[in-house]
Amino acid sequence: MPARISVAIVCLFVCVSTACAIDDYKLGPDSQPQEGVPRGTMIQGKWVSEKIYPGTERDYWIYTPAQYDKSKPACLMVFQDGGGYAKADGQFRIPVVFDNLIHRKEMPVTIGVFLNPGTVPPTEAGQKGRSNRSFEYDSLGDQYARFLLEEVLPGLAEKHSLKWTDDPEGRGTCGISSGGICAFTVAWERPDQFRKVISHIGSFTNIRGGHVYPALIRQKEKKPLRVFLQDGTNDLDNLHGHWPLANQQMA
């Protein structure tokens, strides 16, 4: 899948731009470790929800840039399906991209929080847990935003002695497919907390009602959001909807 992550981040934190392209994306220098660029640190853990999605378990990763000063709040970006984004040798390579862009001062010092969707543990030995991904990501409303704001982010900040900004202009969300619509929903519901969104192939379709967003955007008062939408003409077209068309209508 295309991974124009460095372009997206620069667009969100630095400038506003509109682009349309059909090509095979190739990783550029921003996605490769560069000589002389200090590397941030990654830690991994497991979060068990006790409030918003009680009983669900999920892995998380936290990226802290080398330039982070604990006496100053950093910017914050939250990634859904975080395991894929957190891999330094994966498709997105967020730790590497952040290292390079922060070093060149093309984006502010930013902590990355990478969350996998929750899993409901099995009730019997030998069974697999049940994924809670679609319920968490595709549902409209503020439940997932509350999960972040009331449970995960305060808990992780306390546990790992981290400080990030309360300014919504310095806080973003990111995701792919159902994670993309989830990232948008968080900012849509709580623009007082998050105002930057990156959506890769966002599922603005009728999986759990997300097809209503283009109409809602037209009908509701304009919100102070900066959104990067990425999709391709060969993406899904099925009973839930047409992904490329849905993303065009969002714009």
Question: Where are each of the predicted segments found?
Answer:
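Positively charged n-region of N-terminal signal peptides that target proteins for export
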Residues: 1-5
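Bacterial N-terminal signal peptides
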Residues: 6-17
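Non-catalytic cap/lid and distal C-terminal segments of serine-dependent acyl enzymes
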Residues: 21-251
